[in-house]
Amino acid sequence: MNKPVHNNEHRRKRFNKKCPFVSAGWKTIDYKDTETLKKFITERGKILPRRITGVSSRFQGILTLAIKRARHIGFLPFVGED
């Protein structure tokens, strides 16, 4: 007898994303480190969500604050560069 195909058999396997800041042993994120901050924003200048970057909840808040500070000071653009 044939087994019915269930929807969960077609789903992709999930993998655990490790927070890059926790695994590197960071305590804070410096708003002057623009090269690191640019990895967490899109081409249009939006902050990437946790589900894409794998950043922990604690560091997502710190990262968001650092990006906003860098924008206000002028280290990062508010909108993406063409």
Curated annotation (Swiss-Prot):
Keywords: Ribonucleoprotein, Ribosomal protein, RNA-binding, rRNA-binding. One of its GO terms (cellular component) is cytosolic small ribosomal subunit. GO terms for molecular function: small ribosomal subunit rRNA binding; structural constituent of ribosome. Part of the 30S ribosomal subunit. Forms a tight heterodimer with protein bS6. Binds as a heterodimer with protein bS6 to the central domain of the 16S rRNA, where it helps stabilize the platform of the 30S subunit. It comes from Chlamydia felis (strain Fe/C-56) (Chlamydophila felis). The gene is rpsR. This is Small ribosomal subunit protein bS18. InterPro entries: Ribosomal_bS18 (IPR001648), Ribosomal_bS18_CS (IPR018275), Ribosomal_bS18_sf (IPR036870). NCBIfam families: S18 (TIGR00165). It comes from the Bacteria. Belongs to the bacterial ribosomal protein bS18 family. One of its GO terms (biological process) is translation.
